[in-house]
């Protein structure tokens, strides 16, 4: 078994030999991402001691949800955030904690001044761009937030900016934990049962290859899967009567996943950014990029197909047991063949801690110390 290296930052350990073009595409994407320079530390030698969760980029909303002149509320677990655009410069987006640091009023009803300040309605305290917490970025039609991020930009979705591809976004709240949501995105066995009325086939995936990736600069570990899938009758009509599609799935810990379905010269990419809302509720931000159809009607057809599939996932996610020590003890006592990737993903989540109010308080205390040192 060989180990490949793409730049020094990434080690790639294939579980099986490399044989598919989808995987080679994945390697090129990883190489490009390795070249991205991580954001330098801003006086923060170590992340919050509980875990590094807030240092990863988190999608907190779609771009069209954050409008000029109106505060936007987003929660990352128990961390309450308020986001606003500067009316004078709509490309300037700021974020702070949705608790006024004067006397504790919520800021989601604050006024946004002409100069781009967020003005608390209790006593008139104004938040300028020096009162922000963390970094906020608009990327590929979504709003991302991170505190002292490892990477300078969020991860890219393949082909998103390709002029030959149509793109669209969806948002779904699932009654399931972040862990269950993550495992679902990399599980290639459930479509036969959950998506039998969609793309699911009773023919199991073939030529499964499983891979792991590490980026030491950005403190991320990613998992990859490549496989061939036999289309059912419905999907063959969509896929120009092509019987077999080539597929590549990737999960970038802790909250980002994308999949690539390819046949002939056609490609469909589904990106999923996961946002934990509670311990057992997760928001899925779905990005669709494809060159199946060029028309707006074709774009709506693909959105409708994705919505149908998400409703099927929603029904299963509601049936997941809530997170508990008992569930963790039972999970994967039974493992099917070729499930090394989802088992490894579950192992990655052993270090995950739900971002509860104590972690949020620790983050703010560390932020406050950093601010005090800069004065």
Annotate each predicted stretch with a short phrase.
Residues 1-18, 22, 34:
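N-terminal chloroplast transit peptides
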Residues 26, 31-81:
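Zn-dependent metallo-beta-lactamase
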Residues 27, 55-59, 71, 144, ...:
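Intrinsic-disorder/low-complexity, polar/charged segments enriched in Ser/Thr/Lys/Arg/Asp/Glu/Gln
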Residues 54-59, 67, 129-132, 193-194, ...:
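Short Pro/Gly-enriched beta-strand edge/turn motifs at strand-loop
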Residues 57, 69-73, 80, 133, ...:
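Short, acidic/polar N-cap/turn motifs at the starts of alpha helices
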Residues 58, 102, 123, 190-196:
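Histidine-centered active-site/metal-ligand motif
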Residues 61-164, 368-375:
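Rieske [2Fe-2S] iron-sulfur-binding domain
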Residues 150-375:
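C-terminal catalytic domain of Rieske-type non-heme iron oxygenases
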């Amino acid at each position: 078994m060989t180990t490949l290296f793409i730049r020094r930052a990434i080690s790639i350990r294939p579980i099986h030999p490399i044989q598919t073009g989808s995987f080679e595409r994945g390697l090129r994407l990883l190489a490009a991402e390795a070249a991205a320079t991580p954001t330098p530390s801003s006086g923060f030698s170590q992340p919050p001691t509980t875990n590094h969760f807030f240092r990863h980029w988190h999608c907190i909303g779609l771009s069209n949800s954050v409008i000029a002149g109106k505060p936007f509320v987003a929660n990352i677990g128990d961390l309450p955030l308020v986001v606003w655009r500067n009316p004078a410069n709509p490309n300037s987006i700021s974020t702070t904690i949705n608790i006024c640091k004067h006397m504790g009023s919520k800021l989601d009803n604050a006024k946004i001044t002409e100069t781009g300040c967020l003005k608390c309605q209790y006593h008139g305290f104004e938040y300028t761009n020096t009162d922000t917490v963390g970094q906020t970025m608009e990327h590929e039609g979504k709003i991302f937030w991170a505190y002292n991020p490892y990477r300078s930009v969020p991860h890219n979705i393949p082909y998103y900016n390709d002029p030959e591809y149509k793109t669209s976004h969806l948002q779904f709240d699932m009654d399931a934990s972040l862990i269950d949501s993550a495992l679902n995105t990399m599980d290639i066995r459930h479509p036969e049962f959950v998506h039998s009325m969609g793309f699911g086939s009773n023919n199991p995936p073939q030529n499964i290859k499983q891979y792991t990736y590490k980026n030491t600069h950005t403190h991320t570990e990613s998992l990859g899967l490549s496989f061939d899938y036999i289309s059912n009758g419905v999907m063959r009509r969509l896929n120009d009567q092509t019987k077999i599609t080539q597929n590549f799935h990737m999960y970038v810990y802790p909250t980002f996943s994308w999949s690539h379905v390819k046949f002939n010269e056609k490609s469909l990419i589904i990106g999923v950014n996961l946002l934990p809302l509670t311990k057992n509720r997760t928001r899925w931000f779905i990005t669709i990029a494809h060159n199946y159809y060029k028309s707006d009607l074709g774009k709506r057809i693909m959105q409708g197909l994705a919505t149908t599939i998400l409703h099927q996932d929603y029904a299963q996610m509601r049936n997941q047991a809530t997170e508990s020590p008992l569930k963790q003890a039972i999970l994967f006592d039974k493992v099917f063949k070729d499930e090394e990737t989802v088992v490894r993903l579950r192992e990655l989540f052993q270090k995950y801690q739900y971002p509860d109010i104590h972690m949020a308080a620790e983050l703010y205390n560390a932020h406050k110390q950093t601010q005090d040192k800069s004065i």
